[in-house]
Amino acid sequence: MADIWLATDERQKPYALRRMHERLRFNLLARRRFVRGAEILSKIGDHARIIGYVEHGKIKGQLYLLMDYVEASNLKQLYTQHDPVLLENVAQILIDMAEGLEHMHENGFMHLDFKPENVLVTRNASVRLVDFDLAEPIPEKPRKASKKNPGTPAYMAPEQLQGEPISHRVDIFSYGVSAYELLTNQKPFPGETPGEILAKQFDRSGFVPPRQYNSDMPANLEKVILRCLERDPERRYPFIGMMVRELQAALYV
């Protein structure tokens, strides 16, 4: 949807410049998503686990978003490459990305596309959440998922895939999928299509608990992940702050 460029100001301070692809210049839906994501980022407020917002606007018809520059790789790149930054800091990364989501929720927004590709990690293991194009305000009560807000099927909650009412708990499910994958290098509900993924989410007969792939995982950490992955949103954590506290206890006791 967009390219990221390195930009500098008159003092040579670096920034990350996100520009919408030229081929989407006249795509109204894509433009709305880009602007919405920029506006939501501007409203989330400063936080150590969220990419810093500078400004957004339009120059000669081209939409842009200017952000803090962070020299980093995304989380998927790190675990695909077995990067030592991840291997040495996995516990803190798990907590930091959860705290980023917690800050979003506390400020009234849900991400709706939380996945490893949208988590940046620097060489000193500092985490930043990015890409808020699909984010939306948290509704007062679960509302029907938009068919025009697809997300990424492998990380979507069952209610998202079915187009049923959604709430902030879809982010908790997506976090559980991401944490499971990070710790096992496997997806909890593998499938080539949204239908196949949804079928695995409902029929758990083939589900493999993460400790079967990674026996070094603390049992209490597995409990946190399994609660995040509950099919029924009411059985997941009611709010992500509770999950963060249990995650911290599981990883640092």
Predicted regions, residues:
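Protein kinase catalytic-loop region centered on the HRD/HxD motif
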Residues: 99-109
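AlphaC helix of the protein kinase catalytic domain
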Residues: 75-85
